Amino acid sequence: MPPPASSVDFSNLLNPQNNSTDSTPSTPVDSSKTPSTPSSTQSNSNMASSVSLLPPLMKGARPATEEVRQDLPRPYKCPLCDRAFHRLEHQTRHIRTHTGEKPHACQFPGCTKRFSRSDELTRHSRIHNNPNSRRSNKAQHLAAAAAAAAGQDNAMANTASAMMPPPSKPMTRSAPVSQVGSPDISPPHSFSNYASHMRSNLGPYARKGERASSGMDINLLATAASQVERDEHFSFHAGPRNHHLFSSRHHGSGRLPSLSAYAITHNMSRSHSHEDDDGYSHRVKRSRPNSPNSTAPSSPTFSHDSLSPTPDHTPLATPAHSPRLRPLGSSDLHLPSIRHLSLHHTPALAPMEPQPEGPNYYSPSQGHHGPSISDIMSKPDGTQRKLPVPQVPKVAVQDMLNPGSGFSSVTSSTANSVAGGDLAERF
């Protein structure tokens, strides 16, 4: 009887819990079908059980994982609200929503956007990487405009710096000669870096533009002039160097800083005097009457003759040894106004070299008061030179001690050579 068997099969599928009750009455109905009936009911029961088990598995998967996540500890709590997080980076990212911090900046040129999350930055970077996007084209235009503005700034800086270098061409001709002829004329390293920086910015003829360039500091002009004067005049041969160094065509600011250049290189070359070889000492002896810097290595010989620093302070006593100091009396007559202008403004800023120039300018004028200084210096005995000496050099020594600059070696040699070593006892 096929219809009852089919009905029993559908009922097993729809109602699996009635498998036992339905299967027992079906067996007496047809005894010939008994071998096939258990197999059909077993297959139907397996299918029903599989169908009945599928919904709980599909429905219970997500709640089970959620329960596990809820059971995990949340040690990272937000200090500004009640939320807690499993991981530290999640807490950090959440705190940025309170503080407004945006540490992730776009690296595309011209783009100034910042983001608090790295995934937002990654999503934003795709805008720049996509060439078909309108925003990427706009960003490229902004970047090009920013680059053009930066290029204009650089061009303005280059044009401003290019206004001075054309006069610096004569210096390139004289610089190799000065390096070969007189290597120890270079000042200490700090001053060389400072002076080279000033020289590149101001140029060799900066002393002629003092009155025109009112915006520049006169101290910087004096520094550049001193460096230029050394590079120009010490690099030529002996004869023209003497005439160009003391010709009346020089301005006061160009001539007077040579004292500072001489003072600095005087101390430095005195320290290097023991390192000279025979070939270089020959060049020093050849240029001694004309080069004020090269007279410094032979200063110990002057100190034995009681004339060591006297070319700096009493030019009447040593006209033959130091021709550089002889025209300083005429310089006071030529341009006194420029000299006083440089005197008043150079001590305002205190680089190394313009500071001690004040006492040096007045010391030659003090030496011109009485010709008795030459008579006193010509006396071989130191005891005869004791009493009159503090009248003139005492003021110069005090003026040199007041600035506290790099003239300590010169002042000590002055006290020993002029006063016979006991100048400090009379103070």
Curated annotation (Swiss-Prot):
Region (Disordered): 1-70, 117-140, 164-185, 269-333, 348-388, 404-427
Classification via SUPFAM superfamilies: beta-beta-alpha zinc fingers
PTM note: Ubiquitinated. Deubiquitinated by creB, probably to control its activity or amount.
Top-level division of the source organism's lineage: Eukaryota
A Pfam family: zf-C2H2
Compartments, record wording: Nucleus
Biased composition (Basic and acidic residues): 272-281
Zn finger region (C2H2-type): 76-98, 104-128
Compositional bias of kind Low complexity: 15-52, 289-303, 404-419
Subunit and partners: Interacts with creB.
Function, in words: Transcription regulator component of the regulatory network controlling carbon source utilization through ubiquitination and deubiquitination involving creA, creB, creC, creD and acrB. Represses the transcription of the alcR, alcA and aldA genes by binding to a GC-rich region in their promoter. Also plays a role in response to carbon starvation and the control of extracellular proteases activity.
PANTHER family: REGULATORY PROTEIN MIG1-RELATED
Name of the protein: Probable DNA-binding protein creA
Keywords: DNA-binding, Metal-binding, Nucleus, Repeat, Repressor, Transcription, Transcription regulation, Ubl conjugation, Zinc, Zinc-finger
Record family assignment: Belongs to the creA/MIG C2H2-type zinc-finger protein family.
Signal peptide region: none
Organism of provenance: Aspergillus niger (strain ATCC MYA-4892 / CBS 513.88 / FGSC A1513)
Gene Ontology CC terms, in alphabetical order: cytoplasm; nucleus
MF annotations from Gene Ontology: DNA-binding transcription factor activity; RNA polymerase II cis-regulatory region sequence-specific DNA binding; zinc ion binding
InterPro entries linked: creA/MIG_C2H2-ZnF, Znf_C2H2_sf, Znf_C2H2_type
Gene3D superfamilies noted in UniProt: Classic Zinc Finger
GO biological process, one term: regulation of carbon utilization
